[in-house]
């Protein structure tokens, strides 16, 4: 089991980064916020969880152990796999997620693409007593530049990858960039996620 990866960031894409450690490049899937805190050519450390399937081994990376624990906890809910767990962490930061679960805030949970009302209610029932809604002391992840391509295209592609309809993703990207045309990909993507969360 690979519990963490430390090394030079070789590549930053929309949904993953490649980090070289001891001569081996590890592809690590992560949320936009986590990827935004990385910088190509600089050293980084991510706490990781490895998901092993019959036909694949996938690494998921997190800025801290708290996020990793929530990722694992989410997957104990029936119908929630790694992809949906990551989408949840992309839309709701750890503090907001714990609060939503502890308070039974179904509306907040249904902002996540792929989670409907019944799924959100199931999450609350199964996880309410397992989370601590006390605010985290960990700092916010700093945002930085992402990969290639236009900022708009990257935002749309990332949102579609998280499960949002293409038209909705395009509208959110256009709205965010109209208000802040100089935004980096990571900043704009977080704004778009926030906007979509409010309109769901």
UniProtKB/Swiss-Prot annotation:
Residues 142-146 are annotated as: Flexible linker. It holds the Pfam family RuvA_C. It comes from the Bacteria. The keyword DNA repair applies. It is found in: Cytoplasm. One of its GO terms (cellular component) is Holliday junction resolvase complex. Keywords: Cytoplasm, DNA damage, DNA recombination, DNA repair, DNA-binding. The keyword Nucleus does not apply. The RuvA-RuvB-RuvC complex processes Holliday junction (HJ) DNA during genetic recombination and DNA repair, while the RuvA-RuvB complex plays an important role in the rescue of blocked DNA replication forks via replication fork reversal (RFR). RuvA specifically binds to HJ cruciform DNA, conferring on it an open structure. The RuvB hexamer acts as an ATP-dependent pump, pulling dsDNA into and through the RuvAB complex. HJ branch migration allows RuvC to scan DNA until it finds its consensus sequence, where it cleaves and resolves the cruciform DNA. NCBIfam families: ruvA. Homotetramer. Forms an RuvA(8)-RuvB(12)-Holliday junction (HJ) complex. HJ DNA is sandwiched between 2 RuvA tetramers; dsDNA enters through RuvA and exits via RuvB. An RuvB hexamer assembles on each DNA strand where it exits the tetramer. Each RuvB hexamer is contacted by two RuvA subunits (via domain III) on 2 adjacent RuvB subunits; this complex drives branch migration. In the full resolvosome a probable DNA-RuvA(4)-RuvB(12)-RuvC(2) complex forms which resolves the HJ. Has three domains with a flexible linker between the domains II and III and assumes an 'L' shape. Domain III is highly mobile and contacts RuvB. This is Holliday junction branch migration complex subunit RuvA. It comes from Rhodococcus jostii (strain RHA1). The gene is ruvA.
